[in-house]
Amino acid sequence: GDVYKRQEHMVLGKELTEQEISEGFGRAAQKLKEGQQFAFVLKKDFLEIEEKSIYVNDNSLIREDVIAQIIESLDESDVVVSTTGKISREVYEQSDRINGSHAQDFLTVGGMGHASMIAFGIAENAKEKRVYCMDGDGAELMHMGSLAFIAKQKPQNFVHICLNNEAHESVGGMPTGCVGLSYAEVARTVGYEAVYYIDTMEELKQVLHDIKPE
């Protein structure tokens, strides 16, 4: 049958010129338009391996320690919504270690950029609860319009925490598109009523204490 017919293909090797490769892609595109298949076979070492991004920052705080401190400060009625990637993994681990359960957690796994609006939705529909959104700088960058929307609504039981390491650490550590951006200034500019920039564990403990309702 047709499935056993020789499939048209092209072997890609370093000896090929850019023109030859371009012509090969043209043939492949034509075959696909005709509803046929086309395969590219890559010789060993055809692709060059680039050096892995070296992930470094000069932050004095460690994300896992910050997450642990936040979870330790929670009241039983509080809710945590965490963004995708390592933040949710560490929220899961620290909640397990500190509380022995995940009853307060909503882990936004696979929903990069959506944690803040999910947290806002919970806050709006459960005003008796305090909702902590643990966001990452890369995830927050995905849907920055949500900051302006949330600020306009002025929720009184919503705490938005951006853990900024200036990198997409979960997928290799490449820098985000806004290295050096002050997320605190962005939040202040769009209308967040109270904004804190935290650089030490002592500052974190103080702010977590100060923002609790009296």
Annotate each predicted stretch with a short phrase.
Residues 50-112:
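Active-site diphosphate/adenylate-binding microenvironment
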Residues 10-12, 40-42, 79-84, 106-110, ...:
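General beta-strand structural signal in soluble alpha/beta enzymes
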Residues 39-43, 81-83, 134-135, 159-164, ...:
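Short beta-strand segments
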Residues 92-165:
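Thiamine diphosphate
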Residues 91, 176-189:
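Short, glycine/polar-rich helix-capping loops at beta-to-alpha or helix-loop-helix junctions
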Residues 23, 50-55, 91-95, 144-145, ...:
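Short acidic, glycine/serine/threonine-rich loops at helix termini
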